[in-house]
């Protein structure tokens, strides 16, 4: 597992990033992450962005990845981190972390995630994983552009902007191709409904009201299945807008203070 860390706060924040594929942020993306996490650093947290395990078995599931993070916390953080922020596919892993390893964190926030990915989201992410695994940043960028510009009418614009986006934001060499595909398979097979009632710690779930990957109805179902869940919906926002909003750290820190 590879990592990026900054800040000298006494409390540790572990960020479990989305996927398929997990990377140590570089270049433009690293700057975006630093801005996104500035509020946590100001609140006294040391930030840890940790990738998934490298060279995972092909059969590795989201539950197995949660076990990997729990093992990391046990071995490198003394058995407990102050706060876990788990986003998108990382939030899928976070659901299993909360259910199977509640002692490994003080608080957990799940951002733009839910019990199951939509059919559209599965299709897009499967194509994204194939492009990233092939080392084709341009094609991966074109698929990424579909997050913001879905539908046939904007295909020409996605194909125009995609290669530029891919080269500036994505790093196909940063994660083994086999791991990207393993994460994609785990994502496609993911359905956490059976495990959610087993979660005992309080959970903060933040979702976009117009998220095509994790529709609001599924997010609401997820919150109902978790015994102690606070759901906040950003009504007008989709997946990327909600996940990158400055409201996220504000709401997460308010949740931590309240608990």
Region roles according to the model:
Residues 85-90, 94:
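Gly/Ala-rich beta-loop-alpha elbow adjacent to hydrolase catalytic centers
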Residues 212-218:
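Conserved alpha/beta-hydrolase "acid-adjacent" motif
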Residues 95, 99, 107-135:
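Flexible "cap/lid" loop of the alpha/beta hydrolase fold
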Residues 228-259:
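Catalytic active-site module of serine/aspartate enzymes centered on a nucleophile-bearing elbow/loop
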Residues 1-57:
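Conserved HGGG/HGGXW glycine-rich cap/lid loop of the alpha/beta-hydrolase fold
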Residues 119-121, 139-186, 195:
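Conserved alpha/beta-hydrolase catalytic His-Asp/Glu region
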Residues 64-82:
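Conserved acidic catalytic loop of the alpha/beta-hydrolase fold
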Residues 199, 205-207, 211:
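Short beta-strand/loop motif that positions the catalytic acidic residue
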